[in-house]
């Protein structure tokens, strides 16, 4: 990366930093790193937008500090007159900015040396690219910068949460290491976009409230409406990942859930069924008027969500497509179904059993794939195969221990061990096991929907 030479003539950036009651040290660390590590020919301004902070030190003290430290006006302080939330505050920050390119950055970051040139260079090549730096971690306790961003890019879960996924690993010494990596989604706190293009494609959805879902909505919209989203390895920015949520939610509203309904209804077509499978409570939720966003989609002549899945995120697992069967895995004798028991699926854990919810719980939805995996969105069933051993959910792989055979005999057989899935006489909230195959009804299972068996 250090050997790459960039043109002196690149679009100039307005870096937009939104803050609300941010700590003095982390806010100024962010701003100083931007100004100090951005060549002046590329930095038009830093727009520091205060979303109605009520801490005294962020009022006159901050105003005076900015005036004394940057008398040339490179840092501008803009304030909202009421609490807007991160989404509407970013719209306000973008409207206040006058540079060629908008770079949105959270208020608890550190820009690294050489961070801005790769972003501006990529946009200068194609104004329809939205580009993100690689995100390194800053420890939230020690505030130490750790250059561990690696090659992770963005994905999403069907519950419409952002997820990190591994990009194509490239050796650091390879010339290909510096090439941008296409990404289905972005985290949303750190990205660059040409200012006019940002507004051409609809900025943010102003009907979304406070925080949540806006990053996926923008990601889907960019791809579906003719743009591209990339991570740029030679641009690196540190970010403090906090142990608690930095935003307050007026009225304790589930803003992520409500915003995600708006996203699903406008952009996901029939695939919104998977969001509602996870969030049945949102089916009756008032999500406001989305007519303007639907008109925007038509005006921009955007493609379908199926096109997005096929062309941008082809490895995204779809529970009811290209599978043998899917839905509840039910033991008739006990009326128990396999169930995650609401455990964190980013961890490895034993799969449990719970009274069948007849499609009312996403925790009971599994798919039997053509590779004979019994799986969830990212994890597959596996077991050691010993008599009475439990069955775990682990990240899917090609391990033979993850192969299960299910046929019209209604057994589910672990291929590597030849053992059968068995309730073991367990109760609801207990754990399923494998045992030597018999004809016992505790080993008889059916799936809710058979597509090809």
Where are these regions (language model features)?
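Conserved donor NDP-sugar-binding/catalytic core segment of glycosyltransferases
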Residues: 110, 114-164, 228
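The conserved acidic donor/metal-binding loop of glycosyltransferases
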Residues: 52, 106-110
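A recurrent flexible, glycine/aromatic-enriched loop bordering the glycosyltransferase active site
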Residues: 87, 161-192
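Acidic donor-binding segment of Leloir-type glycosyltransferases
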Residues: 35-79
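A short, conserved alpha-helix in the catalytic core of glycosyltransferases
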Residues: 118-119, 185, 189-202, 207-235
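N-proximal low-complexity "stem/linker" segments adjacent to membrane-targeting elements
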Residues: 1-36
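Lectin-like carbohydrate-binding module/patch detector with strong preference for beta-trefoil
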Residues: 317-453
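Active-site nucleotide-sugar/metal-binding loop of Leloir-type enzymes
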Residues: 35, 68, 91-101
């Amino acid at each position: 990366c250090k050997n790459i030479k960039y043109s002196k003539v690149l679009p100039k950036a307005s870096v937009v930093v939104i803050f609300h009651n941010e700590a003095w040290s982390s806010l100024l660390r962010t701003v100083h790193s931007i100004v100090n590590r951005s060549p002046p020919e590329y930095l038009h301004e830093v727009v520091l937008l205060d979303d109605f902070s009520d801490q005294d030190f962020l009022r006159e003290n901050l105003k005076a500090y900015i005036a004394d430290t940057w008398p040339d006006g490179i840092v501008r302080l803009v304030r909202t007159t009421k609490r807007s939330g991160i989404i509407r505050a970013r719209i306000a920050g973008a409207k206040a900015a006058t540079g060629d390119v908008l770079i949105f950055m959270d208020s608890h970051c550190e820009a690294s040396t050489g961070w801005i040139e790769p972003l501006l260079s990529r946009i200068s090549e194609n104004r329809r690219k939205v580009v993100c730096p690689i995100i390194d971690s800053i420890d939230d306790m020690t505030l130490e910068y750790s250059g561990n961003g690696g090659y992770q890019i963005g994905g999403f879960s069907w519950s419409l949460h952002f997820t990190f996924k591994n990009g194509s690993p490239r050796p650091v010494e390879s010339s290909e290491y510096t090439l941008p990596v296409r990404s289905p989604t972005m985290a949303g706190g750190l990205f660059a976009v040409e200012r006019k293009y940002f507004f051409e494609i609809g900025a943010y959805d102003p009907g979304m409230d406070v925080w949540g879902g806006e990053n996926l909505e923008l990601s889907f919209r960019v791809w579906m409406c003719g743009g591209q989203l990339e991570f740029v390895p030679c641009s690196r920015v540190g970010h403090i990942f906090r142990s608690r949520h930095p935003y307050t939610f007026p009225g304790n509203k589930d803003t992520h859930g409500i915003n995600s309904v708006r996203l699903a209804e406008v952009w996901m077509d029939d695939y919104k069924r998977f969001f509602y499978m996870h969030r049945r409570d949102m089916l009756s939720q008032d999500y406001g008027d989305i007519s303007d966003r639907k008109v925007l989609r038509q005006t921009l002549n955007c493609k379908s969500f199926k096109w997005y899945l096929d062309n941008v995120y082809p490895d995204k697992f779809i529970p009811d497509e290209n599978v043998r069967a899917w839905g509840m895995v039910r033991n008739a004798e006990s009326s128990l179904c396999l169930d995650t028991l609401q455990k964190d699926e980013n961890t490895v854990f034993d799969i449990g059993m719970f009274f069948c919810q007849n499609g009312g719980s996403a925790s009971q939805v599994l798919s039997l794939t053509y590779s004979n995996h019994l799986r969830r969105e990212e994890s597959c069933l596996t077991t050691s195969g010993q008599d009475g051993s439990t069955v775990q959910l682990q990240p899917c792989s090609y391990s033979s221990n993850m192969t299960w055979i299910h046929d019209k005999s209604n057994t589910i057989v672990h291929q590597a061990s030849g053992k059968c899935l068995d309730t073991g006489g367990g109760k609801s909230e207990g754990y399923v096991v494998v045992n030597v195959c018999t004809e016992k009804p505790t080993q008889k299972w059916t799936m809710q929907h058979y597509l090809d068996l």
